[in-house]
Swiss-Prot record:
EC number: 2.1.2.1
Organism encoding this protein: Bordetella petrii (strain ATCC BAA-461 / DSM 12804 / CCUG 43448)
Localization per Swiss-Prot or TrEMBL: Cytoplasm
Binding partners and assembly: Homodimer.
GO cellular component: cytosol
Site features described as Plays an important role in substrate specificity, chain residue numbers: 228
Reaction(s) this enzyme catalyzes, per UniProt: (6R)-5,10-methylene-5,6,7,8-tetrahydrofolate + glycine + H2O = (6S)-5,6,7,8-tetrahydrofolate + L-serine
GO biological process: glycine biosynthetic process from serine; tetrahydrofolate interconversion
Protein's name in the database: Serine hydroxymethyltransferase
Sorted UniProt keywords: Amino-acid biosynthesis, Cytoplasm, One-carbon metabolism, Pyridoxal phosphate, Transferase
Amino acid sequence: MFDRKLTLSQVDPEVWAAIQKEDVRQEQHIELIASENYASPAVMQAQGTQLTNKYAEGYPGKRYYGGCEYVDVVEQLAIDRLKQLFGAEAANVQPNSGSQANQGVYMAVLKPGDTVLGMSLAEGGHLTHGASVNASGKLYNFISYGLDANEVLDYAQVEQLAKEHKPKLIVAGASAYALHIDFERLARIAHDNGALLMVDIAHYAGLVAGGAYPNPVPHADFVTSTTHKSLRGPRGGVIMMKAEYEKIINSAIFPGIQGGPLMHVIAAKAVAFQEALSPEFKQYAQQVAKNAKVLAETLVKRGLRIVSGRTESHVMLVDLRPKGITGKEAEAVLGQAHITVNKNAIPNDPEKPFVTSGIRLGTPAMTTRGFKEAEAELTANLIADVLDNPRDEANIAAVRARVNELTARLPVYGG
């Protein structure tokens, strides 16, 4: 038995104390890590329900356990809402992460050693798109494509590599690429060369849902995503696919790479998809893109370089070399000023991966807390103020005070 009256703070004061400190950090800091966001109270409430207790191997109506009649309702709501949100023919909401969603597609359509094209990690791709240190790069023969001389996705290179290597699958999508991706063109290249197309929109999903970024679903055979990041849901993954691939994808997820699904997380996914279907979310997605544009333009005015010259999404890579500071140091000093970013390699980066010449910035979280263009411009200027004098403690303290004033005015959960 457990004591129903005991709260978390009473059962485990150490964990409770860390959570309280993290709450303060999230309220006080400007969050600019492009992959982070703030889930709504409703999404978090769904994750803390009794659904965490339920095992439900299988799919709605076809479970290997009894007592699944109510979790069936929840999972079917998540599936139906996801399909409606993106216009998908079929969907699987069980992947526990974006990485597992990608792995599920690979399991479904590839054999070890098959050739795949994916965007180079060094030029904006993701670990699961064939990086040598990742299982994808160890199991399959990934050939990397990248950017052209103008730091735009090199579609001509993709086409040339597809003709030369005849891959089974082409993977599109990125973790650090600011511009629109021409999914229709990539689909044509893939299908003309006998390949399938998988698009990973983990970073762009919220913008796609809100009409602020191109939708790959009409063009791709498979679309994978996380449900957090710009979609503002719980941490997890999804796969959307053409109806003809539904059976093999479902089998690849369960029993292929996962057992019982996390039903409390699937409930939170359903809630997040419902939120994303609202007119307010469309406005949010548009504001994310507007804020990113202002952030990038202001940083350029302050002497920094944006990789690819601009952003057409929520994310941007900032080349710090004009300021003579590394990404590692910039991350640290901006953190002292209560501005949270992550160091990130830029194309052809001369620095080591743990040092880097750049930082990656994103606007989903700042927009969730109510930042608009004026706050985005101010944030960019505060970043530049720190980077202009990164070793001046008085300067960092002055910026931190202004950040604290701004975040107190626009709290996340109410302070």
